Amino acid sequence: MRTISAQEITNTVARLCIEANTRLPADVEAALAKARQEEPWQLARNTLDLLWSNLSAAKEADLPICQDTGMACVFVELGTDVHIEGSFEAAIHEGVRRGYTDGYLRKSIVADPLRRGNTGDNTPAAITVHLVDGEGCRITVAPKGFGSENMSRILMLKPADGVEGFKKFVVDTVKLAGSNPCPPIVLGIGVGGSFDKVAYLAKKALLRPLDVPNPDPYYAQLEQELLAAINQLGIGPQGFGGRTTCLGLSIEQMPTHVAGLPVAVNVSCHVTRRASAEL
């Protein structure tokens, strides 16, 4: 049995909140760099250059890449042989509170969805814990802005809709979103499970690096086909047209009921943020 203190969790989460908001993951940065080289439309290239300049300035000045520093989505892979000394969830919330305060990150969370009073410290975080074997503890902080989150969709397709219905829903989601999610976008796509699980799968898909395809060749091929179809829409960077509408997408799947075909698309902007640490 291994013991991890609540203080260590707090310190780690605070650091990851700042890191995620000021540094793009290497895979997303590489995809943006590649798009700058390959985009054939001049206006689209100019737009990508501006996004790159903003990214570089944030890195140089250690400032947030985007003014929307997001809702702190925290994912934990926790070993079953780990004992947390202190309150686990309270430690995560305190880490978010400290990270957003010390990093001068915008406070964007309201305590109640209808009464709308701001909590003033960007808590509470949205916490997801996945139990795994062993004594490990891996924490990922993925701040999620809501310009793109609001463009996300879920649909309970009929089994008869099949793969073509699945693909159409994904592409139509991007069409409907247009320029609203600050393209070029990144998509997390979930398929299968139940109403609640498929939304989780879509969010989980955003955690997979863009250069890592689905391990199932069938879904890896679907990822390529969908990316090509989306980039033929002509929405382009910030909606100004061009070939670069989507930097990449990932599909996560799970078994489902014989009568269902749940699909969820979690839309993310070109500032798709995540930072991880092993404790």
Q: What function would you assign to each model-found segment?
A:
Residues 1-189, 194-279:
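Non-transmembrane, aqueous-exposed alpha-helical and coiled segments at domain scale
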